[in-house]
């Protein structure tokens, strides 16, 4: 090589096919099918399947749910505050649907000494790996369903869209504020009742 000139083009020997799907920022976008959700509802008496339903009908990220503290859960008004999110836009109020409100109440009362809504059998804060490996994954395998916690979020967004919910309301609920137009951010405001009404339609 002389003067930065190479006599041979070696790029033709580089195989990029094996790397094309290795995007570290790519999430699993598969959503739960209706029959799969129905199967999970059949297990609703199990408190750990209840967590899956809480994820499906809130659209929160798994980290947001596991980090949710009781002090930020408002059962009477049917919403909770997400104050810990991976993005600034994720800080928001999330409505609690009527159909899963009893599960929030049950978890809220299940371990008075734990500050977190969800907790291990020992009353400790759930770490993601612990929750996924010991609970979510085995529960899905038991039902023959191949899904990840993030699929719950994507499913909620899809169900809201299919129910004809206003796109701005969907963005408010799931924390996609970064995708909002300036007009949506500045001039569009919804009270919690409107958000609860929206989540109750799925």
Label each PLM-derived region with a short phrase:
Residues 1-2, 96:
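Non-catalytic DNA-binding core/recognition domains of DNA-processing enzymes
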Residues 2-12, 108-114:
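Proline-centered turn/helix-capping motifs that create local helix->coil transitions or kinks
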Residues 6-8, 12-62, 66, 86-89, ...:
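Basic, Lys/Arg- and aromatic-enriched nucleic-acid-binding interface segment
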Residues 84-88, 174-201:
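Catalytic-site neighborhood detector that most strongly recognizes the C-terminal catalytic loop/helix
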